[in-house]
């Protein structure tokens, strides 16, 4: 159940901030807009090299209403989902599973004690 490197950050912004946000991360930080799986809602993935390090999602409400402001979640690559599932259940941590069809990844979402959403990504064998 070891956790690996940080995979990406997800930034939640209002629709009015899309242009400025994309311009900032692409023009100033040098990220490149690239492939994003179909999730049924608008958003962008920005890449550093061949890795999507920043995910941008939209919300109509003010992005600072939650306990973490605009910071939506942190995602980490991980291994041994059965072991982690046992650990989460043993500690009474509620979680959600989501299979991303476009790229064979099992995503697990749960919250830390501060309300920050954490995502663990488990790469599935093809």
Q: Where are the language model's segments positioned?
A:
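Conserved N-terminal glycine/acidic-rich loop preference
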Residues: 2-5, 10-12, 44-47, 56, ...
């Amino acid at each position: 159940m070891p956790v690996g490197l940080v995979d990406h950050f997800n930034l939640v912004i209002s629709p009015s901030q899309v242009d400025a946000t994309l311009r900032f991360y692409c023009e100033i930080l040098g990220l490149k807009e690239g492939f994003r799986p179909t999730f049924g809602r608008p958003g962008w993935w920005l890449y550093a090299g061949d890795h999507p390090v920043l995910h941008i999602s939209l919300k109509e409400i003010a992005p600072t209403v939650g306990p973490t402001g605009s910071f939506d979640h942190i995602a980490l690559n991980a291994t041994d989902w059965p072991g982690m599932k046992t650990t989460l259940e043993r500690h009474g941590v509620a979680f959600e599973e989501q299979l991303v069809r476009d790229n064979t990844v099992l995503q697990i979402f749960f919250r830390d004690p501060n309300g920050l959403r954490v995502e663990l990504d488990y790469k599935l064998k093809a």
